[in-house]
């Protein structure tokens, strides 16, 4: 599957590095000047996490992003999977 969250589908995104120099006009300067834009990647913070499923009596290993882990810890795995139209059977 590569670098992708198995629940939310978050994956690597692409963008630009934008170097800025100079003091902002608001702070009394001549204004910020933007240099040459260069391409960069924004990678997902992925974690291999094991969850215990009491209904099945098994541990399930899922590759998820850190933000997904925070959401799961707030609402619970079953609620979060239902919200994202996934089932536990997809990960067994």
Curated annotation (Swiss-Prot):
SUPFAM superfamilies: L28p-like (SSF143800). Pfam families: Ribosomal_L28 (PF00830). GO terms for biological process: translation. One of its GO terms (cellular component) is ribonucleoprotein complex. InterPro entries: Ribosomal_bL28, Ribosomal_bL28/bL31-like_sf, Ribosomal_bL28_bact-type, Ribosomal_bL28_sf. GO terms for molecular function: structural constituent of ribosome. It comes from the Bacteria. Keywords: Ribonucleoprotein, Ribosomal protein. Signal peptide: none annotated. The keyword Ribosomal protein applies. Belongs to the bacterial ribosomal protein bL28 family. HAMAP family: Ribosomal_bL28. This is Large ribosomal subunit protein bL28. It comes from Borrelia duttonii (strain Ly).
